[in-house]
């Protein structure tokens, strides 16, 4: 599993996805991120994601984003787990 610190993430690297629920995302989030809730992302990855793009996943505690990275890697996506988010 590839990892990166949130402070090292730059928009040019790829798309930053916050997998928290919309309410938690609205309360506080990285301004460079887009919100795609964990369940929605995993159920609809084939229509939401492009295997030719790079994705960086974050959440508040790291559990869901880490789990999502493992699953999406299995499906062949270029995903990186963002730590210290």
What are these regions, as identified by a protein language model?
Residues 34-40, 75:
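A short, gly/pro- and small-residue-rich
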Residues 15, 32, 51-53:
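A generic structural signal for short beta-strands and their flanking turns/coil linkers
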Residues 16, 33-35, 79-81:
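Conserved beta-strand scaffold positions in the cores of enzyme catalytic domains, especially
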Residues 46-85:
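Catalytic cysteine-centered active loop of the rhodanese-like fold, especially the PTP/DSP P-loop
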Residues 7-10, 41-51:
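Short amphipathic alpha-helix with an adjacent loop that forms part of the alpha/beta core around
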Residues 1-30, 38:
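Flexible, polar/low-complexity N-terminal or interdomain linker segments that lie immediately upstream
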